[in-house]
């Protein structure tokens, strides 16, 4: 969608679909240095989220995967079934700002093994008091797992550092 919207600027704009952490490598390979500006689409693609096989949605019986790229090895199922209660709690709190992270982590460990997204969602929905009726009580847990699995914050941090290196003066 973004690419189509920016088509009229193709002389001044290059559309690249890649992980943020590759920005410097791509700029050097494409020989458009120095860059005068960089635009990042930080939103999550609904095309990826809607793929049932990835387990991003808590509304479907889908494997607990949550990887954006199948080249990654760690899945949500791995995290939920092998990490300690403390590690899971930390992930939920740090990446999802989940206030009930300890209780959810305890429930996860007590209900192992987990294989499907709807299983995890049901455990949370049936045991966690809902404080915000506008969002599903599983939302923050799924967000936290997705961010952790895909190293989204690490990628963004690397990207920002590299962006400063490839931006020209006044960029």
Residue ranges of model-derived segments:
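S-adenosyl-L-methionine-dependent methyltransferase catalytic core, i.e., the SAM/SAH-binding region
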Residues: 1-171
